[in-house]
Amino acid sequence: MLNYLLYKIGYWVVMHLPLKFSYALAVFFSDLHYVFADKDRKYTSGNLKAIFPDKTDKEIRRIRIRMFRNFAKYLVDFFRFPIIDEKYVSRYVTVKNKQYIEQALSKKKGVVMLTAHLGNWELGGLVFGALGYPFWAVALPHKNKKINDFFNNRRESKGVHVIQFGKAARMCLSLLKENKMVALVGDKDYSNEAGVVVDFFGRKTYLPKGPAGFALKTGALILPGFMIRNPDDTYTLHMEKPIESNGGDTIETLTLRYAAIMERYIKQYPQQWYMFRQFWI
């Protein structure tokens, strides 16, 4: 209940302050949270050291602080969903390689939109809607129903159709057969170790089977995309070339193909990778 009230208070504050002041307030509370968040500091430090084994503790700490601050700004943007419109998208968002979206849809086999807990993946769905592309996203439900409804109401207020994790398989397959776009977060398996084991930054971890599994079953293309925050708090939506499975692909080999792309972006923007839990096996 406390977390829900904090979200509601944060939402109210953000909706009544200019964006610049909302960000400043978010950074202040992020720094305060950082002091007391022992587990979050521990997990993020371990994850960053796995990616950058040669960096000093001071360098890791600097990245980690920026990560906490960026995540706080991510929440500000998410709370502001009801007032984000096409004017905002036009002013604050640049889309790179937009042609890859049409290229993927032209195959008429559906598109698995593959992203990560990087930058602002939630805003990515809103941008696709603003560009005129119907969009479905698989979301992990919160244990607290009020928090779950709070998040989903904001997603759906901007045309992002939410598919609850646990009920996703049949609906995703059906949507892909209708040449729709289905978004999945591909950098963390939430199915109690039922994912596929892959090497990620040279260490074993579980990644979800969903993106590769759906692509292999339907012939859908996997379209990697990442909404990255820029230093001036604008965004760039980076689209990568669609990945098409070949006759020899398995879930493991196809997962490795897009895992390499996620590695590249996470390494380039580690201060925007919000993995506040143990990642590797």
Regions found by a protein language model. Give the residues of each.
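Membrane-anchoring hydrophobic helices of lipid-metabolizing enzymes
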Residues: 1-115
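Generic alpha-helical secondary structure signal
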Residues: 1-4, 39, 43, 123, ...
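Hydrophobic (often cysteine-bearing) scaffold residues that line and stabilize catalytic clefts
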Residues: 2, 60, 120, 147, ...
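Non-catalytic C-terminal accessory region of glycerolipid acyltransferases
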Residues: 36, 62-65, 103-105, 130, ...
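Catalytic core of membrane glycerolipid acyltransferases/transacylases, capturing the structured
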Residues: 107-166, 189-196, 203-205
